[in-house]
């Protein structure tokens, strides 16, 4: 037997057993493609430790990680969606709701909680993008107005994390009127001199960006978040021009003065607390203590 035959001789190859890795342990970054340990990613609030890409995070997880542990109580859960128009496109709206509720374990696209942030009383709301694209429905509008009313009642600031594709077309005018409804509610908050901070996350588009998302006393965005009314492809097709690089991203909007700050997700809790402390004339937090997600 020649040396080359000895190398490729099957009898010398040691068989190995394939190890089955349980699902849900590893995941890939949407941006850099790096393989990431899921537990580590969750600890980092779904921010890639390799490239700092901000992935989508569940609304409930976001609120639990933002508010003080053990201080949260949910508001507005009694509001539930109804298919009043019996709307149907390629699928019945009723079926879309059932499917979205099954996937997200939520009743609609906005979650509202009351709690404390470094000991300060606060009402916080967060959009669930996985629920029909975080679209604004009559229930979303009702819950947001309820959040504003609760902030007025206990005289505390309101913080809202937006992630939405816009108004929910399946509810037609009932969805569109939520733009005016939420804006009017925020006007009441402004009259009482209570701070409202809007945190725009990827993506914040359509009717949400044209109403409650841009009405904050401070408008903050996460890095590289897509923010606008119509999408960049639609704008390019309409104006028939090539848009600038990074158009509608948070960095572009900050440069043009449309937003006030860009803050990384892991830093939001501490920095928003500092801003609210200044706005409400309370002691500014000194140390950002870490706590586990509930």
UniProtKB/Swiss-Prot annotation:
Any one Gene Ontology biological process term?
malonyl-CoA biosynthetic process
Top-level taxon of the source organism: Bacteria
List cellular component terms (GO): acetate CoA-transferase complex
Cofactor field: Zn(2+)
Matching entries from InterPro entries are given as: AcCoA_carboxyl_beta, Acetyl_CoA_COase_Trfase_b_su, ClpP/crotonase-like_dom_sf, COA_CT_N, Znf-ACC
Q: What GO molecular function terms would the record report?
A: acetyl-CoA carboxylase activity; ATP binding; carboxyl- or carbamoyltransferase activity; zinc ion binding
Cofactor detail note: Binds 1 zinc ion per subunit.
| Chief localisation class | cytoplasm
Q: Spell out the subcellular localization from the entry.
A: Cytoplasm
From the UniProt record, give the pathway where this protein acts: Lipid metabolism; malonyl-CoA biosynthesis; malonyl-CoA from acetyl-CoA: step 1/1
EC category: transferase
CoA carboxyltransferase N-terminal domain: residues covered: 25-294
Its recorded reaction(s) are: N(6)-carboxybiotinyl-L-lysyl-[protein] + acetyl-CoA = N(6)-biotinyl-L-lysyl-[protein] + malonyl-CoA
Which cysteines form disulfides? none
What is this enzyme's EC?
2.1.3.15
Q: Which UniProt keywords apply?
A: ATP-binding, Cytoplasm, Fatty acid biosynthesis, Fatty acid metabolism, Lipid biosynthesis, Lipid metabolism, Metal-binding, Nucleotide-binding, Transferase, Zinc, Zinc-finger
Residues reported to bind Zn(2+): 29, 32, 48, 51
Zinc-finger ranges (C4-type): 29-51
The similarity comment for this entry is: Belongs to the AccD/PCCB family.
Q: Describe its assembly.
A: Acetyl-CoA carboxylase is a heterohexamer composed of biotin carboxyl carrier protein (AccB), biotin carboxylase (AccC) and two subunits each of ACCase subunit alpha (AccA) and ACCase subunit beta (AccD).
Function in brief:
Component of the acetyl coenzyme A carboxylase (ACC) complex. Biotin carboxylase (BC) catalyzes the carboxylation of biotin on its carrier protein (BCCP) and then the CO(2) group is transferred by the transcarboxylase to acetyl-CoA to form malonyl-CoA.
Please give the name of this protein.
Answer: Acetyl-coenzyme A carboxylase carboxyl transferase subunit beta
Which organism does this sequence originate in? Blochmanniella pennsylvanica (strain BPEN)
């Amino acid at each position: 037997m020649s040396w080359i035959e000895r190398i490729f001789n099957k009898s010398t190859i040691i068989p190995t057993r394939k190890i089955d890795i349980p699902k849900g342990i590893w995941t890939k970054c949407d941006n850099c493609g790096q393989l990431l340990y899921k537990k580590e990613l969750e600890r980092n609030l779904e921010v890639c430790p390799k490239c700092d890409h901000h992935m989508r995070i569940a609304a409930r997880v976001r609120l639990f990680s933002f508010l003080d542990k053990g201080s949260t109580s949910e508001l507005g859960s009694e509001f539930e969606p109804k298919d009043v128009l019996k709307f149907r496109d390629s699928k019945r709206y009723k079926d879309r709701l059932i499917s979205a509720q099954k996937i997200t374990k939520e009743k609609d696209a906005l979650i509202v909680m009351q709690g404390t942030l470094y000991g300060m009383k606060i009402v916080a709301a967060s959009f669930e993008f996985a629920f029909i694209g975080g679209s604004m429905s009559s229930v979303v509008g009702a819950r947001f107005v309820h959040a504003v009313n609760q902030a007025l009642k206990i005289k505390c600031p309101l913080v809202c994390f937006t992630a939405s594709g816009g108004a929910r077309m399946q509810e037609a005018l009932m969805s569109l009127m939520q733009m005016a409804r939420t804006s009017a509610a925020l006007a009441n908050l402004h009259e009482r001199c209570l701070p409202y901070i809007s945190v725009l996350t990827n993506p914040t588009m359509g009717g949400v960006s044209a109403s409650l998302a841009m009405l904050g006393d401070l408008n903050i965005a996460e890095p590289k978040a897509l923010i606008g009314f119509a999408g960049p492809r639609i704008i390019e097709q309409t104006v028939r021009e090539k848009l600038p690089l990074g158009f509608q991203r948070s960095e572009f909007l900050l440069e043009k003065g449309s937003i006030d700050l860009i803050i990384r997700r892991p830093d939001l809790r501490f920095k928003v607390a500092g801003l609210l402390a200044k706005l409400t004339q309370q002691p500014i937090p000194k140390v950002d203590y870490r706590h586990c997600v509930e």
